Amino acid sequence: MGQIRTKIPQVAILLETTHGYSRNLLQGILKYQNLHGPWGIYFEPGGSADQKLPSKKEWKGNGIICWITNQEVEQSVLSARIPTVLIDPWEEYIVPTHPFSKYCQVRGNSHEIGKMAAQFFLEKNFKNFAFVGDHPERKWGRDRQIAFTGVVSQQGYRCYSYVPEFQEGYEAEADRKRLARWLKKLPKPVGVFAAIDVRGRQILAACLQSGIRVPQEVSVLGVDNDVLLCETANPPLSSIALDEENAGYQAAELLDRLMKDRSLKGTVITYNPKQIINRRSTEIVPSSDKLIVETLEFIRINSGVNVNVADIVKYMNISRRTLECRFKSSLGCTILEEIQRVRIEKIKSLICETALPLHSIAEMCGFDSESYMGKVFKKFLGCSMIEYRQKHSALK
């Protein structure tokens, strides 16, 4: 039986809505309060400049959930002296001498994010690796770099790194040109891990303007899976989806407990990456064999058609035996296995990122029936499509 309430808790949520990351966190917070509230919520949509607490005369608050991005919010939260949960606090806020170090926190597991990115490129048989960071003072970015570089190094490979110079007089255009020059010098093909999606878009733009082919020469993977940013990139950006909605839910749950028991201060909860959402920026498996690259591109653009090995051999104008041998030598799989892999990836993407009925997905992926697609899907992943959607959907 829940604790009897005598009044509705007043909670301020300071999260900018310009990022998919923070919107997903907000969804999780609202989900918790809908189940366990009600709360009286104070929230202002907008960017970081719009995030501020109302005056104490206007608002008698009981709790705060916040992502602090400027000093004004920092000072207002400190002076509020009410139960607060910090989400992904900056490095300066978690050093033992800072008052925020004693606050409850929900943090992303940046080491696991970096490891996931490295494994992703290694499984695609890359031999060249690079990392592009965001602000050098952001600990989460450095942690992602350390983990990514560490896994790559353990496999005997070198990782090239680029970190922007945020100094006095910094200019975005100058940084873009410097980034483009750096990308040109990288050994190709190369798998590039961007600390966040915004950086991933900048890499793609620099490649486009410099005539660097994506993904044939440079494959790019971001973090956050901000769908608007990723889908409007050229080409669309692959990204690591984080469990942000669950993080928001846990932040709200932690605040609820904290408002009832202030002795919980200092509790830290971490949330993990969920999965990699594959888009065109990483769709080509690296190979020095131009025939293989062209074949993979043909398979990709026909992922919604019931294309078979004979169709591919005819299009490439080469004997099946020769193409199969070069495929096996270059990629370690058969042509049919690659066709099936690409189709499964498309099914997974449509299941996770849309609410389309399964029979519509079957049509879009070149299957004659939903039932046959379901059999193929279960053979590869060991679960039904409904089970997969329930577990991985970005829309839930």
Descriptions of predicted regions:
Residues 327-334, 376-388:
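A secondary-structure capping/hinge motif
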Residues 1-65, 71-320, 324-325, 329, ...:
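Bacterial carbohydrate/catabolite-sensing allosteric modules
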Residues 373:
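Binding-interface segments
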